[in-house]
């Protein structure tokens, strides 16, 4: 069965009741994957072990799943780096009864892969996509944590956080906890509090990256790119941030070409350009031609295709220059 972020509570209930016997977690958000595993270990009083899928054979998996430990506790077994193809012997084992609880962990699972389909279609199995938090999800995390401490947050502060806190789920939660601790003696958290606390490295984001790239400020672009990669943000998300930026430029340049005022054209964008970036965005529009904008969009779209075809040897900077 497929579970989404809003259904995680229900998933935990089904696992605790023994109705879900194995779990597949896939995607680039390692922090969220670890958070789910940690919750299960803590709340269901499990021990844990870990093994790479390629080091596993069917006999050893059968032994791991059916071996009681000395203390009589269930064990959460992390099976890392599972691929897209389902081994028929694995299917047979997971269809039977066993003692321990396996969690299979994959990176980027193919939507048509037999492993993902198997976990989605069987009632006793579950699958959760663990992708980096989008702005709506980040806002829910922020407001949820603040509600527990009876705090509120200004509109400017939450807009800044939604725009800048991109990446690993655990990293986002850590930064919000730091902010709450810093502002322990105030009821309302403001933008000034945020700017004083949130790490400059954490606030690397796609908007800044795109601004640097379109200004041809490659030194800062590479620095920002390195920070994003340290946050476990993969190349596809980075490329799509650049594509969104150039689509905004394309929309504005097209409207200006058709006689619309530049300021009005920029204000028409949805979601809007963050106010800290408006001056830079305006300068880029003045310096960029519509033809060059379209050419860059095509390069970025091809870069995404190239990455998906051969991620191991992909170099983003070389692909889009």
Curated annotation (Swiss-Prot):
Gene3D superfamilies: 1.10.8.60, 1.20.272.10. It comes from the Bacteria. Its EC number is 2.7.7.7. Signal peptide: none annotated. One of its GO terms (molecular function) is DNA binding. One of its GO terms (cellular component) is DNA polymerase III complex. PANTHER family: DNA POLYMERASE III SUBUNIT DELTA. Belongs to the DNA polymerase HolA subunit family. Part of the beta sliding clamp loading complex, which hydrolyzes ATP to load the beta clamp onto primed DNA to form the DNA replication pre-initiation complex. DNA polymerase III is a complex, multichain enzyme responsible for most of the replicative synthesis in bacteria. This DNA polymerase also exhibits 3'-5' exonuclease activity. The delta subunit is the wrench that will open the beta subunit dimer. This is Probable DNA polymerase III subunit delta. It comes from Rickettsia prowazekii (strain Madrid E). The gene is holA.
